Amino acid sequence: MTRTVIGFVAFALATEHVRSSDPSPTPTPDKSQYTIFNPTPIDLRRPYNTDRPSKTDSPYTIDAGVFQVESDVWNWTLDYQNGVRTRTWIASNTNFKLGLTNWMDLQVFPQFYVNTRTSGPAYGTPVEHDGFGDTTLRLKINLLANDGGKLAIGFLSSLKIPTNTGNTGNHVWEPGFELPVSYSLPWGFTLFAQTRIDILDKPRSSKMRVQWQNPIGLSRTIVGNLSGYVEFYDAVSTGPWVGTLDTGLIYQVTPNFSIDVNAFFGLTDNAPDYNVFSGFGYRF
């Protein structure tokens, strides 16, 4: 999968080089002077974009001085393995984003409520936990084509902080970093992908483990303001690999507000069986 992502980037860079030889390209306004203290004027803002709802993040950052909220209203996951059924319910899984410069934004991503219930014939008495979830800090920079171009590349670093209560998570700080990319295809399609490394807690051990994620997908406008996407996600670590098929619909209510509904399906035994959720994004 990683070879696929790298090959995709190499091909897109070559194509973009040919495209850039156009003798009369549309000039891009210089926005390098704008910061959180000198916000980007509204008429110079780039098109609205979010890091939701697919597992692949956007390579674009929000404009300097802009505040944006992206949130799951509800998120329900079911996993059944070896006679044990685990149900997870998350409410208000919210990403607060602030544009720092024309090419960098800061994100604070708390889980306001998490409820897990474990049961099944191989488990015994059902156990339920609920409370505040973890908080993730993220810093994203755009490396290419933040304000135009077929190929866009970003870089995102993150740190999960164990703020959970009520035994809804582990108590380990978990860093990660990723390289998200997108490429505009003919007929209105967009190809998106990323490669990501996380340093995660290893269950029932004092050691950490490395997880490598490589989602890839396609998105397109369906009709009017309604668009959809399909994504294949895989993650490899010290245990069995995880694969899911992800899909969803996004409706652009206004130029600064979108809503979405999504369903992810496990393709491997080690993946959650079902994950359905709905949410929104809003740019102030």
Give the role of each language-model region:
Residues 13-19:
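C-terminal segment of classical bacterial N-terminal signal peptides
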Residues 21-284:
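Transmembrane beta-barrel domains of Gram-negative outer membranes and organellar outer membranes
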Residues 3-12:
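Bacterial N-terminal signal peptides
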Residues 1-2, 20:
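Extreme N-termini of proteins with methionine-enriched Sec-type signal peptides or N-terminal signal-anchor
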